[in-house]
Amino acid sequence: MVHLYYDSRTGNVQRFINKVTQITGWQAHKIEPEMPVEQPGHLITYTTKIGCVADKTLAFMHAHADKVFSVSSSGNRNWGPNYGLAANKISHDFDIPLAMKFELSGTMEDINQFIDIIKNQYNDSKRGSQKLDIA
């Protein structure tokens, strides 16, 4: 079973997760302060302010980075080089592979690409696997 850990502020990541879980049946867990994490999985978050990682996401990573296989982020291309920058920062700071970036709540093409990446690259992968940055 694939587990997805996500943080959503405006609802874009929530909508993305809803579509992914409806298609796949994967388990989604909304990040909450001090939540226990028993199963390893994939992080999906958003970029806030001007290319920053959300505080709740950052706290989650400090507590559970050893159980995160990959990171993906929602963003807005209007922010230019800051688009989805949270994923880049998390990938770099925690040595987690960057799976993908998607705009706002993602298109169906984004949803299918994410599912394909997780199924074929990161399902049951070992941490420390070679980074795949296709964002």
Question: Where are the predicted features?
Answer:
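Short, charged N-terminal beta->alpha structural module
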Residues: M1-G25
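FMN-binding flavodoxin-like domain, especially the glycine-rich phosphate-binding loop
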Residues: I23-Q27, P33, E38-A135
